[in-house]
Amino acid sequence: MYQTNKKATTNCIGIEYLQNAFEPEEIEELENNLNKFGIKLKTYSSAPKYIMGIEELFPQIQIFLSSDIAQAIYLGIASSAIWDGIKLFFRSLKNIVKKKTFTHVSNNKVNTKATPNIHVTIGESHIVLPIDIDDSKFEYFVDKMFDSMDKDIVNEEKYVFYDAEKQTFEYYTRHEVTMKSYQDWKEKQNSTETTTEE
């Protein structure tokens, strides 16, 4: 295991995470799984931070695919070994994260069963990993996550969310994510006020 800068090179996956999000043996497991498929893992841990903004825009764990891997996937020329390695990586990551305790503090409320915000970053696009869905739906997500991505989407700042019920990918700009978050907050506030009045 080695920590380096965030730039991913040929056949490489980078992972940036908050300190203490993973144990050394968990990173080693991810690294060993990728090595079997000829893919290197580069890691970068950063100090925990307070977020003053829309949470969906700030991942606690961020995954970077090297441009060579991303391009091979888009062109449909990724070897089965690389594709199998990527699928195993995401499956292993989900299993590791689901066993861990993440704490979220907001408005003086502490949630000790929080799900971390995980992004897969390709170019300017961020695919938000749906960790809270069952394994079969997650497998489907991983199989399909690159299908609708193309060069234009990758070159624009987009946030990609997966709707497990509809099995669709929804694309939003940063502004749209902000507006959606505000609308959700507003509806929640109105709902709370209505309940209080009753």
Where do the language-model regions lie?
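Ordered, amphipathic secondary-structure segments that act as subunit-interaction surfaces
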Residues: 72-96
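Short amphipathic alpha-helical segments that predominantly mediate membrane engagement
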Residues: 1-65, 87-198
